[in-house]
Amino acid sequence: MARMIQCAKLGKEAEGLDFPPLPGELGKRIYESVSKEAWQGWLKQQTMLINENRLNMADPRARQYLMKQTEKYFFGDGADQASGFVPPTEG
């Protein structure tokens, strides 16, 4: 049976992650309160940020930036948007 959590990002009960996705306190916090669906949304956002900003993941500053953005995405006022990103419109 799937582990259900109250997702902090989606504001609804949803299936939780199978394991902490990151080391440390932030990973534990995400594991306890972020759903698989919300995590997949972050992976897409993270990919856009890496590509648009040409982040080198070997650079500790780039990794630190992404950690801050991860926390803002789930628990703050939202992560930065990729500069050229235009959300899709319905219709």
UniProtKB/Swiss-Prot annotation:
Q: Which keywords does this Swiss-Prot/TrEMBL entry list? A: Iron
**Cross-referenced InterPro entries, in alphabetical order?**
Fe_traffick_prot_YggX (IPR007457), Fe_traffick_prot_YggX_sf (IPR036766)
Name the Pfam families for this protein. Answer: Iron_traffic
* GO MF term list: iron ion binding
* GO BP of this protein: cellular response to oxidative stress
Record flagged with keyword Iron: yes
Does this entry carry the keyword Iron? yes
- Assigned GO CC terms: cytosol
Assigned protein family: Belongs to the Fe(2+)-trafficking protein family.
Q: Which HAMAP family match?
A: Fe_traffic_YggX
Q: Quote the function comment for this protein.
A: Could be a mediator in iron transactions between iron acquisition and iron-requiring processes, such as synthesis and/or repair of Fe-S clusters in biosynthetic enzymes.
**Protein's UniProt name:** Probable Fe(2+)-trafficking protein
Give the organism the record lists. Burkholderia ambifaria (strain MC40-6)
